[in-house]
Structure formats: structure tokens, C-alpha cells
């Protein structure tokens, strides 16, 4: 259930250590950017100079910061920022943010994806700039946040290059999958209690690139469940998806083998035809640079099925 709550929190703001550098840690100035580009403003955040002590409480933002070359400016990331491996992971939490612990890092910029416990207001009282980068609903949201992070950190050219590269790669992948007359259906699993994500979510929008029909849509037609409904086994079996995608392999130990062993699932087409795709939980729950890998995984699965 914790994974489901994580997904819902992210959608309404979209999935889930050792100690990092302390507040007295000297950071080397970032290269490849000019201080002449400052001051800069993104939304309500203005940076008079390039930040050198960034704290990221959002795994996606952490991935973006390192992808655009701002890694040397990051002094601490939250406990869910598992990538890249050299990110300064700490016990800081984006789900239970502690203003005092964050301030102890002496940050000149904090990045969050959820304003839980009014952390923006709390840090504002401490005069700490905060960029709110909520969960993307569509790819354009992801591209916009990458651009914002590039602007605030002094890496505009790098962020622009990353967005262009992502757009090009995704476009090439999607166009490389042959069109089909009849849409394939799929079930996306958040956890084994049958929570899923509908087409209204960011993850759903990725599958929609391939014209796939989401069997979870019927369980949340008006979006009252924030795009993350729990399906009944009866409904899922009746929907008979052509494909099953598992986003609970790392968290919950699910695999094609465990799905095949589930009672009553043997008649589902995806199970009968061995079309169960194991995804990396982290990649499947974030909206940063590695979304390209997710798009490729979906493309590979679809391409294997004769049109």
C-alpha cells in the first residue's frame, strides 16, 4: 500500500542510505557554465548566482541534475534517490521532509517534487530557495522541468541538449514500431495487490504513444482515484490484457514466474503467450532522462507481437 500512496502523492503534486556530505563540505565550482548568465528566475525562484550547494529531495530531479552536469553542485539527495550511484545519498526524506535537517546542509537551492508538510513555506522562512518540480503528467512536463533545472543551475545548454536528445530518441523508438489495425491491451502493475495506473497518469501517457489500451481505465473513468485504481482479480481476468508490465520487481519480488503462478491467471492472454514484461521499478516511476529506457522496453514488448 505504501507504493500506491507514493504514486498517488506524486500524481497529485506521480515510482519508490548512507550519509552524504555534511554542511561544512567544500564543493568545487561547477564547470561549463558562466556566472555571467545570472541572475536567473524560474517561477518564483530567483538565483543571484550559480548554486553550489543543491539539495535534491526528488529522485527524478537528482537524475536530471547529474545528467546535465550539475552533479558537482549537489551536496545531498534524499533516501529514494538511488541513481546515479555517486549521488550523495542521505537519510533526508522527500515524503517526510525535515526543514532543520535540510537547512543543516546549508543549501543555496532545494528541489522537491511534493510540498508535504508545507516544506516550501518552512524553508522560505529560512530564506532557502525551493524549486517545486511536481510529477509530470505528460512528456512535455518532463522536458520543461529539465529546462528549469538547467536554467537555475547554470547548465542551460546541457539541459537543452538533453531534451533534444530525449525527444529524438523517443520519436525514433515510437516510429520504429509498426502500426497495427487493432490496439493491444495491457495491464501495468504497481504492486501485487493489483493497484495500477490509468492513461491519465504520466506512465499511462508513455504507453499511449504506442496506441495501447489500458485495462485499468475502466476502474477510474472519472479520475476520482487520481489515476491509480485497485483492480479486482475478476475484472482483470475478464479484461484479458495482451501484455502485462510489472513495476514491482524490485520492491515486491514480482516476476513473470510469480505472475504465472497466480491462481486464476492462466487464462489471461499475456500469461498464455508469455508476454509478461519485468520493468525496473525506479525507471518506471520517474520522469527524467531514463524514461527513454522505459519507452524502449514498451516498444520491444509490442514489436514482438505480430501486427
Question: Where does each model-flagged region fall?
Answer:
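Bacterial Sec-exported substrate-binding components of ABC uptake systems
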Residues: 1-60, 157-187, 300-307
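Short helix-initiation/N-cap motifs at beta->coil->alpha
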Residues: 35-41, 90-100, 221-233
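A short, structured surface patch at a secondary-structure boundary
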Residues: 53-115, 212-215
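Short secondary-structure boundary segments
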Residues: 58, 114-115, 135, 190-192, ...
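Alpha-helical, coiled-coil/dimerization segments enriched in small aliphatic residues
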Residues: 79-83, 88, 200-227
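Proline-aspartate-enriched helix->loop->beta-strand connector
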Residues: 98-112, 128, 232-246
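A ligand-binding cleft/hinge motif common to bilobed small-molecule-binding domains
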Residues: 117-125, 238, 242-262
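Extracytoplasmic substrate-binding proteins
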Residues: 119-195, 225, 274-307
